[in-house]
């Protein structure tokens, strides 16, 4: 009976199983170990414990080590539980005070900006009164300037009229007539004419100076006003 022939594998050609390295071994070990998060145990307080803790917190927010131990013994709690509760309660109280302060500050700011009565502020009326008063002052000043300018213009015009009056021209005409004498005229006649012309010129100049004074102007204006009133 023939036996099956078994193939003999040569050591040089037969594949060898690869052995894992140390890095691969450590990686597999890490994968096998799944990290487990420790869940914090939350303390559940009874209503009686909460009443005692809140009452003590209202009276005293910071407790000493001895006071916390006494309170934990009374409430059948651990020292750490009492300490954690007081810390959390203090943080809540500070947050609540901060929120209320922000709300109150916003309310005060809006109250200042909004005017519920609907009346205009006092400074607007003062501004209107000041502007009205300034307009009246400007009108008074403009009227006074107008009156002063009118008087000055009248004085100047009167001076010009007095200076350019026919009396002054008459003096010039007399001088011109004297200068137009013929050279054959006697010397005595020429001297007499010059003296007469000089006296007339002095009289005219004095008259013009008199009428150019402010007192004469006032009298003239009053006289003209009275004459106009009588005509009416």
Swiss-Prot record:
Cellular compartments per GO CC: nucleus
Region 8 X repeats starting with a Trp in each unit, residue ranges: 123-167
Pfam families in the cross-refs: Homeodomain
Region called Sufficient for transactivation activity, residue ranges: 123-167
InterPro entries the UniProt entry points to: Distal-less_Homeobox_TF (IPR050460), HD (IPR001356), Homeobox_CS (IPR017970), Homeodomain-like_sf (IPR009057)
Superkingdom per UniProt: Eukaryota
Repeat region (Sequence), residues: 123-127, 128-132, 133-137, 143-147, 148-152, 153-157, 158-162, 163-167
Record keywords: DNA-binding, Homeobox, Nucleus, Repeat, Transcription, Transcription regulation
Comp. bias (Basic and acidic residues): 26-35
GO molecular function: DNA-binding transcription factor activity, RNA polymerase II-specific; RNA polymerase II cis-regulatory region sequence-specific DNA binding
Gene3D superfamilies for this protein: Homeodomain-like
Residue segments, region Sufficient for strong transactivation activity: 168-232
Record localization: Nucleus
Composition skew (Polar residues), residue ranges: 11-25
Predominant place of localization: nucleus
Ranges where the record places region Disordered: 1-39
Key word Repeat present: yes
Function noted in UniProt: Probable transcriptional regulator.
The family this protein is said to belong to: Belongs to the Nanog homeobox family.
Protein name, per record: Putative homeobox protein NANOG2
